[in-house]
Design a protein with these regions (language model features):
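N-terminal accessory segments
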Residues: 1-81
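Conserved beta-strand position immediately N-terminal to the Walker
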Residues: 84
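Conserved small/polar residues in nucleotide/adenosyl-binding loops
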Residues: 167-172
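Short mixed-charge
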Residues: 139-162
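Hydrophobic side chains in beta-strands
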Residues: 88, 162-163
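Conserved P-loop
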Residues: 87, 94-140
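A generic structural signal for short, solvent-exposed coil/turn residues
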Residues: 78, 108, 152-154, 164
Length: 173
């Protein structure tokens, strides 16, 4: 993966060059991550939180142990798996990672249905609110940088439904 190699090289250079040069390597690293974010779940998870304060980020501080689960979701995305089952302790990040995967699918395929389910109304409500948070706080999450054509068009708190639509700009006359 050439783009991943570019990111590794940029990350390595960040620690070896002057602050001014480091800014350029950081921007190259960031653009490379954005390039992969619509296709690679790990890149998506990393990129959408880049503008959040480090202490508020979900994925970056947990990446070392979430990576196998993220790879499982990537295998589903790539068609290598039809079913992914996850067994991890409570509070390990399963639900939040699942929310991020549903958001990625909703952005990538806004004209298709995406389903997330859970046992109990409180859990389902937290899924709904978690998904919605990424779509309604663009100053904190970079979802629309990754999927600029995807737009939130409707929500239903009672039914816990979120509808996205593929937005195409009107053609000039």
């Amino acid at each position: 993966d050439l783009n991943g190699e570019l990111r590794r090289l940029c990350a390595r250079q960040l620690h070896l060059v002057s602050p001014k040069e480091a800014d350029k390597f950081y921007e190259a690293w960031r653009k490379s991550l954005l390039f992969d974010a619509p296709y690679k779940f790990d890149a998506f998870m990393t990129y959408i939180e880049l503008d959040r304060k480090p202490e508020k980020r979900f994925y970056a501080p947990r990446r070392h142990y979430l990576k196998p689960m993220v790879q499982g979701f990537q295998d589903v995305l790539d068609g290598k798996l039809r079913l992914l089952t996850i067994s991890m302790p409570k509070r390990a990040g399963k639900s939040q990672t699942g929310i991020n995967f549903v958001n990625m699918l909703s952005g990538k395929y806004p004209d298709r249905s995406t389903l997330m389910e859970g046992t109990g109304d409180d859990l389902v409500k937290s899924f709904y609110n978690g998904c919605l948070e990424y779509l309604t706080t663009p100053n904190e999450y970079l979802f629309y940088d990754v999927f600029p054509e995807s737009r939130l068009v409707q929500t239903g708190a009672d039914t816990k439904i979120i509808n996205c639509l593929l937005y195409t700009s009107p053609s000039p006359r």
